[in-house]
C-alpha cells in the first residue's frame, strides 16, 4: 500500500505527516516506511509520457475531462512529484517483482495476549543491501561489511537474504548453507526467535564441538521437510582454536554463508577465531553486520575493512534520523552547581571504594 499527500518528507519526524510512504496491512498499527532511491541501484524502468490524444481518451472514459486544466492535475502529472517518484520506485516491473518475491514476510507475534501473524515488508535500506550483497558476490567479493545503524533490522536483513541468496545460488546449481553468528546467549535466543517467527527452521550451536560437527555435515539443512534453515551459533564460550579444522569434508555443491552479528565487537583481530572461521572454508561468504562506530583508539588496532573487506552497503545515523527510526541526540549544557554536586557524589563513591564499572553494571548501563 502507498499513502501520499504528494509533499516532500519532513526529515526527523517520528510520526510521519508529510510525504509518500509505503506499508503493509497489520493486525493493529500500520507502520509507514520512507522510501529513498539508492544511486548505486537505480530503478530500471521509467514511466513514459503518453500523448495528448491518449490522455484525453482516458479522462473522457472516466468522466474527468473537466480536471485537465486544473493546477492540481497539472502538478500531479509531473514525474518528479513525491507520489509519482514512489510509484515509479515501487511498481516498476523488476522492482515490484523483487518486492513480491523477497520483501514481504508473515511474522508470528503475540498481540494482546493472542498469537497473530503480522505482515512485514522490507525497509528500503534492507532492499538495497540485499541487492548489494548479490552484486558484490557476482563481482567475486566473498566478504564485506553491511553498516546499518542500530535498530535498522539486521536480523531481518539476514532472514531476507536467506530467501534471496537461496534463489541466487540455485541458478548456479549450488545449495547455500546459512549461519548467523552471535557472541552472547541472550542474542542467540533473540535471533533464533526472530528467525523462527519468520518461518525458518533454526538449529542452535552453543559449543565448538557442535560447530565442528556441523561444518563436517555434508548437506545444507538438517530438517527432513525441506524448510529453509539457518544455524545460529553462539561463540561466547568458544576457545581461540574453536574451529581449527583440517579435515573438513568439502562438498562442491555447498556454499556456506556466514552473517557475523555485531562484527565490531566480537572478533579480535589478534586472536585466532576469525582466521579459523575463514580457514574452515575459504570459499565461504562472510557478511559482517554492524551499526556501531569504533572509538578512535580502538580503530587504530582494529580496522574492520581490513578484517571483513569493503562496505557492501551503508545506512548511517543521519539517514536513520531523517527516516524517524533514530532520535537525534541533543547536547545540553550542565549547570555549574549540578557539576559540583556530581563531583561531591563521585568523591564520596571513590572514598567508599566503589569503582565506576560497578556503578555502571548495577544501573544496567
What do the PLM-derived regions correspond to, one by one?
Residues 2-4, 231-234, 285-290:
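Structural recognition of the conserved hydrophobic beta-strand(s) that form the central parallel beta-sheet
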Residues 76, 299-365:
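Interdomain helical connector at the RecA1-RecA2 junction of SF1/SF2 helicase-like NTPases
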Residues 187, 237, 264-268, 294-295:
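Residues immediately C-terminal
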